[in-house]
Amino acid sequence: MDSESIILAAKQTGAQAVHPGYGFLSENAAFARKVKTNKLVWIGPSPHVIKVMGDKLKAKELAEKSGVPTLPMASDVKDAKNLGYPLLVKAAAGGGGKGMRIVNSPKELKEAIVSAKREALSGFGDDRIFIERYVKKSRHIEIQILGDEYGNIVHLGERECSIQRRHQKIIEESPSPRVDPFLREQMGEAAIKLAKR
């Protein structure tokens, strides 16, 4: 998508605000800054928040500081051995399943790291990785939040994103048939807590 064309179209039509929808522009801090620089209202997270949350290492650190539960992680082979197998090697930048490798035994770890780093560098220009314990039969649940310029934040429930191919979402469902009201509220409150940080 051409961000310049979007800003030009907004100005030509007299739009006062830009909502990026979903996908690449919604996760692009430079585009958010450009919208604001052009005296338009950006409907979405601040450029700073986009940048921090787009970096899984920084996002995880912020979540931990906010008291949001996270999986233990390691940044190198030596520390990864303490997590137990299976492991998941993950790219710190990007998404869409790129730079992720499941590791079932110690002999697979070094090659998985090399491979994940190579894919991450090629796809995102950033070869940083981290390692977590791989949780089998896990659910990929995303909490939707909405906030205003006055600091009010609410959660809108969750999206079930567990139907995947190669760690890429195929379909999303809301509400999740696997999340009960108590868990939904706990996860929503954790998301709000993180957003307020």
PLM region descriptions:
Residues 1-197:
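N-terminal beta-alpha lobe that positions the nucleotide/phosphoryl donor
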